[in-house]
């Protein structure tokens, strides 16, 4: 089932417009539709096969949004980006945090080692002996397992870990234990499934669907063997995998004890071509018209918040309200201004965009206007708290 709603609801627009026009919340500003956010939060566990979902904080980047996500049934713990982020979240009262990526931040690792609460709350990720050598004291450790699909002449998927075989898992697991750390988990993320749309038409869509299917078939026995190898060495608390775009496929394999998802709460534009995601767009950013350079054109300040990944059309923000807007073919979405064509707009009018990805939108705003039935709440982003992912 495709995305159910891609434009802001009328009540959301009417709540935000006076705040922007009055200057109380100057544009550009981020907006969260709480009805859609909560709807999406309810939908994801219906695809998780009964497995708990760890909330991927990098896709949310707001403490208030994280709290709301974790209030919903079916969610447990946080999947953080970095040790500094995890330490910050512990300071905010969160516990059960797995850091999804290895850290070489010696200062943060020293802070982790010196803080009893942090050591019990945070699990760090490793994929090599070199990373183990950076750890001090005794900390909770998880091993990252490579889940890429290897085809003749090509590797499909995110290049993450060098640990690919059960033998490699066993060797690194034994080294974790030998050095006095606690091996508590495994991560095995199949990014080439979770982030590859399966609903595109034509030959491109057919190839992507085949890659998703082939990836899961290739990964299942290898991931199962890697998990068994780790369990021979230590009492593993969790095996994490999956993402918003692969919850049902990842859960069905039977190897994982938990899933991860974060983007699904906001449901950015990059998920519009996934057939199994029946969500509603919950996150928008709003820019304001600052000039009308010619009939049929309107230019907004800012707008060019391009998403990470291979440069392509699907990394560009989508103007979704008013309907029918399009970019200039010679300018596109700009850093300081964005010309748009296709609507009868005037100076000070609002234009609503969807970012291509989820958490990256928040790097551009200090706060989010969270619009619900009871009015508008203001949620600080990480940036609004004075820090960013690092």
Regions found by a protein language model. Give the residues of each.
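Conserved, mostly hydrophobic/aromatic
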Residues: 37, 58, 89, 143, ...
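A charged N-terminal "starter" segment
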Residues: 1-114, 385-390
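Glycine-rich tight-turn/loop motif centered on a GG-T
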Residues: 22-33, 96-99, 117-122, 155-163, ...
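C-terminal accessory subdomain/extension
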Residues: 292-390
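Active-site loop ensemble at the mouth of alpha/beta enzyme cores that anchors a bound cofactor
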Residues: 201-206, 210-214, 245-323
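Active-site-proximal beta-alpha core segment in soluble small-molecule metabolic enzymes
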Residues: 56-195
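Active-site loop/helix belt of alpha/beta enzymes
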Residues: 147-267
